[in-house]
Amino acid sequence: MIVLGIESSCDETGLAIYDYSKKKLIADELYSQVKLHKKYGGVVPELASREHIAKLNLLAKKIFKETGLSFEDIDCIAYTAMPGLVGALMVGATFAKTLGLIHNIDTIAVHHLEGHLLSPLLDHNSNIEYPFVALLVSGGHTQLFEVKEFGEYSLLGESIDDAAGEAFDKTTKLLGMGYPGGVEVANLADQATDKSKYILPRPMKNKPNLDFSFSGLKTAVLNTWYDEQDQSLENKANLCYAFQDAAIDVLVSKCAKALQKTKNTRLVISGGVSANKLLRHQLDLLAKNRGYQIFFPPMKYCTDNGAMIALAGAYRYVNGFKDSNLEINVKARSPL
């Protein structure tokens, strides 16, 4: 069973083809709009939608040409329906539904977060058994789930204000740095010369619940930098290190609590922030010290991509899900 996946929820245009019977990704194409939005310091929704319109058909032609497949080989077309930028989602959904109608292929709506949650399965070496705890950590979401079976997700905790990735992005703006924030902060943090110069708070780390808060950490960065008389690149690197260290410390602590609370021994990490080297290192240490299994997506599939949508669509399709009509039903916000 072969699925074409389409991702267009924000500023990445992604198409991929996944073979469920072989558990194999056949092809994957991605166009990133980062350069387009970089000069604005963030994603401009109207521009994002227009870029999806311009690139989707080109990527589709490329992916079929390179694989030698045709639409006759496709059993289902999966597309991101929620959450995301409504205009961008509508472009991808309309493209998918149109292809489905023309070629008489079933279509299936996929939740963007479910795609991220399953993305570690794109690693051929990953054999993830249920149940497990999952941390979704990105620019728009920071959530902990207990996953008992496919499609059975229990929310354990989430950010009550800024998502972790959002805090990274806002920190770069406060410090007059570039976009996207996660990469900029991590790269500059690697250049820190005095890792103990700044001590920042760990919001909600010691709270018994599994919720997060990163707004206060962002404000602490602002106040610290405002009070700093020597705003040199060296001190900016030291502050980036302190921020990243605090944010990662909270994420790892909450993951440990979630595993203890649910009595699980398997942990799945996904979303854009899962590419962070310090986060991976600290969670690997946690797993090693406590005997847990930990699963990350391949680095190239941490951010938005069509491969995870094709994968999630395949799992949904074999579980009996598919669209019942041609209605375009996308949502900016939607819980998993």
Swiss-Prot record:
The subcellular location is: Cytoplasm
- Can you cite a GO biological process for this protein? tRNA threonylcarbamoyladenosine modification
Enzyme Commission number(s): 2.3.1.234
Q: Which residues form a coiled coil?
A: none
Any single GO CC term annotated in Swiss-Prot or TrEMBL for this entry: cytoplasm
Q: Which residues bind substrate?
A: 136-140, 169, 182, 276
| GO molecular function list | iron ion binding; N(6)-L-threonylcarbamoyladenine synthase activity
- Give me the residues that bind Fe cation, please: 112, 116, 304
- Provide the cofactor note recorded for this chain's UniProt entry: Binds 1 Fe(2+) ion per subunit.
The name under which this protein is listed is: tRNA N6-adenosine threonylcarbamoyltransferase
- Species this chain originates from: Francisella tularensis subsp. tularensis (strain SCHU S4 / Schu 4)
Query: What taxonomic classification does the UniProt entry list for its organism?
Result: Bacteria, Pseudomonadati, Pseudomonadota, Gammaproteobacteria, Thiotrichales
Q: Which gene encodes it?
A: tsaD
